[in-house]
Every structure is written in structure tokens, then in C-alpha cells.
Curated annotation (Swiss-Prot):
The chain crosses the membrane at residues 3-23, 34-54. It is a multi-pass membrane protein. Keywords: Cell membrane, Membrane, Transmembrane, Transmembrane helix. It comes from the Bacteria. This is Uncharacterized membrane protein YhjC. One of its GO terms (cellular component) is plasma membrane.
Length: 66
């Protein structure tokens, strides 16, 4: 499996499998319940990971060269 496929799958795995473990309210992160902070963190990480996938993907470089 290529690195870009693993990077693209990380947000899906993190959100899907991490929610049962992060399902807590008591620790507050920046004034938000932990579960909400966890989802916001993954939304930001997803954007960063997709940017990395875009940069690493060789197909995008072919389109820019044309």
C-alpha cells in the first residue's frame, strides 16, 4: 500500500475507531467537551493530511506539467 493511501485513510480510521474511546464529556479542551475537541482536531488534521497527500501525489505533478 502506498504512503498516500495510508495518509488518506488515517482521518477515516481516526474518526471512526477513535470516537468510542473519546466519548467523554468531563475533560474540557479550550472550553469544549472532549468529544467535540476530538472531532475539531480531526477536521484540522484531515485538512493537513489531504494537503500532504496532494503534494506527494505524482498524478498532480503530471497535470501541472501539461
Amino acid at each position: 500500500m502506498k504512503l498516500i493511501h495510508v495518509l488518506a485513510a488515517l482521518p477515516f480510521i481516526g474518526i471512526l475507531l477513535g470516537i468510542p474511546f473519546a466519548n467523554k464529556v468531563t475533560p474540557y479542551v479550550f472550553g469544549m467537551p472532549f468529544i467535540l475537541a476530538y472531532i475539531v482536531m480531526w477536521a484540522l488534521l484531515t485538512s493537513a493530511l489531504m494537503a500532504i497527500v496532494y503534494v506527494l501525489d505524482k498524478e498532480n505533478k503530471k497535470e501541472e506539467a501539461e
